[in-house]
Amino acid sequence: AGCVAADFPGRRAAEGGRRIPPSELEKIGARMKGSAALWRRYYDETTGLLVDSEYYEGTKWNYSFRLLHDMQGRVELAGGSEKFVALLDRFFGYGAEPVVRAFDPADDTTRAALYDCHRFCGYNNEPDIEAPYAYLWAGRHDRTAQVVRSVLRHNFTVGRGGLPGNDDSGGLSSAFVWNALGLFPVTGQPIVLIGSPCFREASLRVGEETLTIAAPGAGDEAIYVRAATLNGVSLNRAWLTVDELTAGGELTFEMSATPTDFGAEVPPSYP
């Protein structure tokens, strides 16, 4: 109040360049251009890719566990199921202390810990959102349940900054909902994978039908599926076809607090 624009310090500073002779401005510009070449650049200006990397917004680890059409071939490429599981364990930092993301965007402490946790997964990145389900092709539904529940518990909250990154048109929030329901769709494939349902009961409208998902024993400890039925028929595979899901009916889970051998029949691959 009472301050005229001509006296505003910021304006005087902004107008300072007008008082520098053009010849001096050219010299300053040349020096700045020369100094810029000395700065360390992480990105190639011509491609936007990381320097010395052929990957965008990720590494070979982040893109290695996408749910490709031929996942069985991916398992074989790793040297078999056990070695594939070992790679996934390393990717997720399995067995390490969980890192709780910074719920307050101004909190740099937990954010720094997230990047110094000696693991490669970043659940804020789309390629990594589906990676927990790669365990299913090695017959390890229990690992999928462990990782998914850990992600939901430690990376999401209802408070300020409650998502682990940019929602990207609903990508993260919809991933939370799918995971909490105990289902996860596979991009470009006619299957929906079974994870670890959090809700004791949920009803979904699927086209003109209704699908009821019942997991009466679900809880913070009971994260493993012991048995499942679809419309009363036993289901020992950790996946549904899209046609089965959209036909509606009732999908029921019996939950367990200890790992089970549910999901021994691995999802299909399409060579």
Residue ranges and their predicted role:
Residues 207, 227-233:
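Short strand-turn-strand beta-turns centered on an Asx-Gly dipeptide
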Residues 224:
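Extracellular attachment/recognition segments
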Residues 216, 233, 256:
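Surface loops and adjacent helix of pleckstrin homology
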Residues 242-271:
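C-terminal beta-strand-rich structural cap/linker in extracellular carbohydrate-active enzymes
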Residues 231-241:
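Solvent-exposed beta-strand/loop surfaces of large extracellular or lumenal domains
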Residues 157, 200, 234-236, 251-252:
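Short, surface-exposed linear patches
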Residues 2-198, 202-212, 217, 243-245:
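Active-site core of glycosidic bond-cleaving carbohydrate-active enzymes
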